[in-house]
Amino acid sequence: MRPGTNTAVRRVNSASARKCAVVCVAAIGIAWWAAVSPARGAEITGKDPAGAPGEAAPDFALTNLAGTTVRLSDFKGKIVLLDFWATWCAPCREEIPDFIQLQKQYSGRGFTVLGIALDEDGAAVVKPLAQKLGVNYPLVIGDTQVAARYGGIQAVPTAFLIGRDGRILKAFVGARSKSEWEQTIRRALPPAAPGQN
């Protein structure tokens, strides 16, 4: 063996080991991100919700926390953020303060949040949380039929932005930041009159 050959081999092996280490660290990082990322949106299957943009949003008749029947068609002419959620879902609860603010900001421009709670215990668990957080938008108690009509809701939160004509503009799986929701809502609303947000 020529002098210096072992040194060259060691250098090659060392460089290969470094490349391997970088690849391994990157793979571990990607795997970790994939494992923790769904928790933000509480995704169960990663399946997109039903309801392609342009399709009519399925109507429903559900009971609100006061026992009154509420229909999606009651809101025709408004931009509706239809939010499927549950009290046991941490990302859902985290979004509620943002929805309260969005309702305050944009309800005067023909926008509303409409929450559909998918809790098995219904109003008994939803009402105390709504009161505690000061929810200012309509909440109704969902059921398996309405979930099925919207594609079998595979994860919460799942939301649908519905246009003034009652057609789906966009579907979302997982939680979003207030700024993301605000951008989406502003794009859907008509231009603001002077002095409006």
Description of each model-found segment:
Residues 78-80, 84-88, 155:
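Short pre-active-site segment immediately N-terminal to redox-active cysteine/selenocysteine motifs
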Residues 49-54, 59-80, 103-106, 150:
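A short beta-strand-turn-helix
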Residues 1-17:
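N-terminal secretory signal peptides that target proteins for export/translocation
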Residues 23-32:
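Bacterial N-terminal signal peptides
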Residues 93-133, 142-149:
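Structural microenvironment flanking redox-active thiols in thiol-disulfide oxidoreductases
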Residues 128-136, 141-186:
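Thiol/disulfide oxidoreductase modules built on the thioredoxin-like
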Residues 31-59, 191-197:
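N-proximal helix/coil linker or "cap" segments that precede and/or mark the start of modular domains
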